[in-house]
């Protein structure tokens, strides 16, 4: 229950900037998203 709330709170707090540790995890998430995007692009090329 607390874990679920923390995830939502983190996301809500991220834009708020209340916690200094929030931007750190956000950056990590962005890196993962970017990595996924690159993989998709590569996959598209392979599919072609």
Curated annotation (Swiss-Prot):
Native species: Geobacillus sp. (strain WCH70)
This protein's UniProt keywords: Sporulation
Assigned protein family: Belongs to the SspP family.
Name of the protein: Small, acid-soluble spore protein P
Signal peptide from the UniProt entry: none
A Pfam entry, by short name: SspP
Biological processes annotated in GO: asexual sporulation; sporulation resulting in formation of a cellular spore
Location relative to the cell: Spore core
Induction: Expressed only in the forespore compartment of sporulating cells.
Region of interest called Disordered, as start-end residue ranges on this chain: 1-48
Major subcellular site: other
Bias (Basic residues): 30-48
């Amino acid at each position: 229950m607390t874990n679920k709330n923390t995830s939502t709170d983190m996301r809500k707090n991220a834009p708020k900037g209340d916690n200094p540790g929030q931007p750190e995890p956000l950056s990590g998430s962005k890196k993962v998203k970017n990595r996924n995007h690159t993989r998709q692009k590569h996959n598209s090329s392979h599919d072609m």
